[in-house]
Amino acid sequence: MNLKSPKLFLSLIIVLVYGNTIFNSFHFDDIHSILEKPWIRGWDKIPQFIVSVFQRPLVILSFNLNYAISEFEVWSYHVFNVCFHIIASLLVFKLVQQIMFFLKDLSAKKYPPLFSWPYIAALVFALHPLSTQSVTYISSRSSILATIFYLSGLILFFKGFGERKFNKNPGHIYFFGSTFFFVLGGLTKEIIVTLPAALFLFHYYFISRESP
């Protein structure tokens, strides 16, 4: 294994930790959210839920895709959750990279990639017990997806200001992308409503202040 590829290393660790959950059965809310929900049983059902914000349509759409792959065989639902968790963890890696870039505290030359702060932060996020339910409990997929959109919005927000500061580019496309992910989050889980406040705080602490 190439230890200079922290993203690959992180992904493999997550697979090793959560790989034994792939055949865990449906539980609790999975019954009425998946097994008893007719909306996931075919692409023709998409128009019935895709316009309903209150039904978290993107989550249902992902279950619809699972049903197309394996119907009610549980393995594909768990594989999706693990893959989404890997994506979220890699986004944490990217976000902390951008924060450190603005703070100018770390550099690739000073710290090997495997031991960098971005990797440590992503590893803590990936393996922390608080993440367990969101990964192993299929109905908690809404939390993982909302986290992906949340982090993507933050990353593009940073990228937009990075373009302004270092490349003299207005960065409008990145700010539009951040807004787009905010909308996707709204179709996934209500926690996304805090994203504008997070953007304000990130701008205040990491962008508007000049590093010493």
Positions of PLM-derived features:
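Polytopic membrane enzymes that build or remodel cell-surface glycoconjugates and lipids
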Residues: 1-212
